[in-house]
Regions:
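A structural signal for short, hydrophobic beta-strand segments that form beta-sheets
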Residues: 20-23, 73, 197
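N-terminal export/assembly leaders
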Residues: 25-28, 36, 99, 117-148
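Surface-exposed cap/loop segments at beta↔alpha junctions
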Residues: 44-131
């Protein structure tokens, strides 16, 4: 699938790169964690996927040569019939991993945002999932916040960031950012239309 600027969307999952998608949906809002993404295709001459492509595999979604999403595949569905081969791969952004994890039980319920990130994201089981943490203003991270062991790690991080007057969001490369998402000016590009074929 190519858009009106002749750029292609590619998915890399496992050791396989897949292009030629018929439908691509990737929601992305700063204030909405665990946005959904979904890709589908149908080919008359398609082949079943190798074993390296499976649920819980890491993925990267490319727009031309630019990474626009790093995530983990939640679900992979294949269908084969006499008409051809169908494939659907879907999931959520990496915030979903932080939502699914609860804050571990620890001595003392007051903790700073910096300590929380070091202890539970960069040095915990999620270290292999979250690529890095970028903090715009480190001077505010000394404020402590009350954390309940039962609440999700994402909620705890977001609450601690709000105490410092900052927001939490994920970058396309899978790193976690804390600060003001609109601090740097951005340019609105030409509206993209995904069409197939190009001369449609």
């Amino acid at each position: 699938m190519r858009d009106n600027s002749n750029n292609e969307i590619r998915l890399v999952i496992g050791d396989v790169e897949i292009s030629g998608w018929d439908n691509v949906t990737a929601d992305s809002q700063v204030d909405t964690p665990a946005d959904n993404w979904n890709l589908t295709l149908f080919r008359q001459d398609g082949q079943p996927l190798p074993d390296s492509v499976h649920g819980a595999a890491k993925i990267q979604l490319f727009y031309n040569n630019e990474v626009i999403l790093t995530s983990i595949a939640d679900q992979i569905d294949e269908a084969v019939s006499r008409d051809g081969y169908g494939l659907q791969i879907s999931g959520r952004d990496l915030a979903g991993q932080l939502i699914d994890c609860s804050v571990p039980i620890f001595n003392g319920r007051q903790i700073t945002l910096e300590e929380m990130l070091q202890r539970y994201v960069l040095a915990g089981d999620l270290a292999s999932v979250i690529r890095d943490v970028h903090i715009q203003d480190n001077s505010w991270l000394k404020n402590k916040v009350s954390v309940e062991p039962s609440e999700s790690l994402w909620d705890a991080i977001a609450k601690a960031a709000q105490v410092t007057g900052q927001h939490v969001w994920l970058e396309p490369d899978g790193s976690l950012s804390i600060g003001d998402p609109f601090a740097n000016p951005y340019q609105v590009q030409e509206t993209l239309r995904l069409i197939r074929p190009l001369d449609n």
